[in-house]
Amino acid sequence: MAASRTASTANTNNGASTAPLRISFAKIKEPLEVPNLLALQTESFDWLLGNDAWKARVEAALDSGQDVPTKSGLEEIFEEISPIEDFSGSMSLTFRDHRFEPPKNSIDECKDRDFTYAAPLFVTAEFTNNETGEIKSQTVFMGDFPLMTNKGTFVINGTERVVVSQLVRSPGVYFDSSIDKTSDKDIFSAKVIPSRGAWLEMEIDKRDMVGVRIDRKRKQSVTVLLKALGWTTEQILEEFGEYESMRATLEKDHTQGQDDALLDIYRKLRPGEPPTREAAQTLLENLYFNPKRYDLAKVGRYKVNKKLGGEAPLDAGILTVEDIISSIKYLVKLHAGETETVGDNGTSIVVETDDIDHFGNRRLRNVGELIQNQVRTGLARMERVVRERMTTQDVEAITPQTLINIRPVVASIKEFFGTSQLSQFMDQNNPLSGLTHKRRLSALGPGGLSRERAGFEVRDVHPSHYGRMCPIETPEGPNIGLIGSLASYGRVNAFGFVETPYRRVTDGVVTDEVDYLTADEEDRFVIAQANAPLGDDFRFEETRVLVRRRGGEVDYVPGDDVDYMDVSPRQMVSVATAMIPFLEHDDANRALMGANMMRQAVPLIKSEAPLVGTGMEYRCAVDAGDVLKSEKDGVVQEVSADYVTTANDDGTYTTYRLHKFSRSNQGTSVNQKVVVDEGARVIAGQVLADGPATENGEMALGKNLLVAFMPWEGHNYEDAIILSQRLVQDDVLSSIHIEEHEVDARDTKLGPEEITRDIPNVSEEVLADLDERGIIRIGAEVVAGDILVGKVTPKGETELTPEERLLRAIFGEKAREVRDTSLKVPHGEIGKVIGVRVFDREEGDELPPGVNQLVRVYVAQKRKITDGDKLAGRHGNKGVISKILPIEDMPFLEDGTPVDIILNPLGVPSRMNPGQVLEIHLGWLASRGWDVSGLADDWAQRLQAIEADQVAPGTNVATPVFDGAREDELAGLLQHTIPNRDGERMVLPTGKAPLFDGRSGEPFPEPISVGYMYILKLHHLVDDKLHARSTGPYSMITQQPLGGKAQFGGQRFGEMEVWALEAYGAAYALQELLTIKSDDVTGRVKVYEAIVKGENIPEPGIPESFKVLIKEMQSLCLNVEVLSSDGMSIEMRDTDEDVFRAAEELGIDLSRREPSSVEEV
């Protein structure tokens, strides 16, 4: 951030003066804005479609002399597949000029009605009959192509999804060395890895022989491959004669000439097949020299040229003989210990092994490329169909339409969005979690790593991550290090490598010119950090500057030797990490937890921006797309709860629709509130309405609460938290959660289901809140078990008595048996109905086959904060509420102000995150204001220089990461806070305050650290975890209760618990736990009967698991019998009739409910 702003200075974050006031402590002027945070997604998708936005970017890049691809993604694959020729080559089909029609439905309609937001794709297909020269051209529909919303998401079947970028090893040539276990010699190897096709691996073993592996098969001498490619022994000696290893390999190679070598290779690749020269030649051609089977891709060709000094054009996707020769030459030079060589293009090349975890060797597959690969697969499947149809159909009658079957293309796109590991259900907990999800980089997924095989090296932080991938934000657990987040300034270049910006330094003068460097370009330069002090002439003030060199080495060098300088101190961290104030004082492990927990914060009813921010809040909220922004300059004309209308300066009107209390993917409430007034002047990009967890266009994930660090009667032992009752009463930490309940009426074998108010055996009072259709009214308060939608399903036909048949003949179908299958509120849920949507096939709504009606009911609940909920700060300081104290019992300041929350001071030192303590001091300062305008101290002079010397009470402040408020500034400001009306300051200059015990009124013996901390309420709410069961579903085979809240399961009484009861001799308790409370089917029904009728509980029977054990032993051909005490064999037969008779009488449903998801099964 630039020099800090007061109300008059423009917001440096956005260029527009629309951001709310935030006084910044930043001392460093940044020459570059944070780029658009969603560009990673949107620009990649624009390239795939080749739309106008992409074309404009390409033109701008070409004008500035950059080398960028001028073909869009879809254009590339249609060109790649064209022409499709039949087997004889007499006819061909080509594709060109794809275009999109406008989408059929708007985004909101798609979400409402479970559609996919997609646009119809059309392609011009030309069929050419090469024998007659006849050309038939047609525009062919290629299916609906899912479109990206302007927020970087896709709407697939009504739900928002995100396609995560994948980090993969870049195609290219890699050299590696490992130590042989037996001889301690270095073994050098080379791998040529294509984008698709067979690998080519070479290695020099401990006997100094150069071997080659073709397509992962057995190893053979590299000279065999050279001979097969047409080289003679003389040529090989001439080229490689100076290297001992190649001479030795040639001597051991007994193949004579090209034919012999080809046959030798064929035998290794296809053992058991009769080798012929032609087959061998074709096989080798197909493996490496056929563009349909082998592709290095542009990026692979670029890496190969760069490594070996080649000159082949970037679109040469196949290997050349020169590439193979150069690779062998490089490998033998590496083995011979040479350090430099000259490439074919005359440049000098360093000979060294590669580090495969370096970001110069790992690239990103973005959304565009991932979808492109998927469409390529679909087109390849279609190509087979087209070929077959060409041969079977009559040539005269063929048109492009009759040849093309779009099913495989549509299916492969659907498959990708529906089932790929990289197409994920969007995390919509709050705007930050959505933004981070879109900027995520994953090394998992098809063609990537698997978390079981990934070692320590891949997961570790690498120096080349600097400014590209955040070293802090990554999940804890099995995915640590495999999933990362793009750094705040990073961008992806045309080859998929992540670039980061640096200021150019020429002759010791730091300029504002910015160059974007990839990781391998950066290795050549000496780079100073962003906080190196600069004089007024933009030269380095210190004689020696701290710099980074290759491989993360740190060094002090004179200013004239510096090539580049970081553009910003927050360049190396991701957006979420850049929102942690005083990050520089926190241990990385805790910062990691802090960044991850901010994504779990639940939007509260009333959002409040942090007193202590980092200046990233505004950009984060605006770029995440959950706030409503003005598209043009103008004046607000009309404002209501549901929409805003602006009269634009160009004479047009724009109406913006707001989201009111809609449900997010995670069940949190998405609600937008207007922040502008009628008649207000707005400029393009200004925030018109706040979304969830934003205030005035800034991220507002939590609340500023008054914190005291002190132990309190042991109630905050081990990170537990004590809260004030005020937070419950005033809904300070209350949030709204919305659940969606859905029921459909289908056609069954016995007739259609019916949604109705007429439900058998249900009293009128249960139906009180249902309307005449049988659907609950909006505004009804519901609790678990209440009927939301009445539905009846036909029962199986029974033999009718003549009387019943007569009745049915007279009164029609009405007498048919139906059972109640109504939608009821699930266990443990409670709330208010806020919305009902009905879809009916008869009214023209599209529904899945077999479904006649679909009803969705939305139930909202207000969750107040309660003990058991999880709270956290931004520094990884998390805890669970153990006690909520009355306001009068809370410790209070001298003026009577009670604190809101008490945290345990022991949670700070061992966790090494004192950033939270600095935060409470600065939070206190911001709430009270300060004035240091006349002081001559160093720290005061620094604040005067950035116009942060006079601050009114309650002003939000920013302390950017690595460039925030210093300790001496905080200490100084604590002495100069603005006093209250009585001229007193509640907090001493030490940052501590005398506190009084709310119960006795006595002061505590020592002053206590008090201040404002930003506290988040996390999504781990106790209401979602509490669970109880009496009877419920049982597992099919063992007949034991299921487990887990989702299955309405029971509490498992396991092996060790049984031992405990055995140890105490509690025989009867144990017997009933193992039988009638678990899997004694007959017994448990009889016990239920006995309880209902008030009789004594009967003797338990035989548990089902015992019967399963006997069956399993019988399946192993063991003859197992159960004998009674007098030696008689006992029949282990189920008396189902008894069970079902008793169950029927008691109205118990013994059938296990259908599982609602694959995981449950």
UniProtKB/Swiss-Prot annotation:
UniProt entry keywords in alphabetical sequence: DNA-directed RNA polymerase, Nucleotidyltransferase, Transcription, Transferase
Transcription keyword on record: yes
GO cellular component terms attached to this protein's record: DNA-directed RNA polymerase complex
Entry keyword Nucleotidyltransferase: yes
GO process annotations (BP): DNA-templated transcription
PROSITE patterns given in the database record: RNA_POL_BETA (PS01166)
CDD domains assigned: RNA_pol_B_RPB2 (cd00653)
InterPro entries with a match to the protein in the record: DNA-dir_RNA_pol_bsu_ext_1_sf, DNA-dir_RNA_pol_bsu_external_1, DNA-dir_RNA_pol_su2, DNA-dir_RNAP_su2_dom, DNA-dir_RNAP_su2_hyb_sf, RNA_pol_bsu_bac, RNA_pol_bsu_CS, RNA_pol_bsu_protrusion
Top EC class for this record: transferase
Subunit structure: The RNAP catalytic core consists of 2 alpha, 1 beta, 1 beta' and 1 omega subunit. When a sigma factor is associated with the core the holoenzyme is formed, which can initiate transcription.
Function summary: DNA-dependent RNA polymerase catalyzes the transcription of DNA into RNA using the four ribonucleoside triphosphates as substrates.
Family (UniProt): Belongs to the RNA polymerase beta chain family.
Descriptive protein name: DNA-directed RNA polymerase subunit beta
Organism placement in taxonomy: Bacteria, Bacillati, Actinomycetota, Actinomycetes, Kitasatosporales
Gene: rpoB
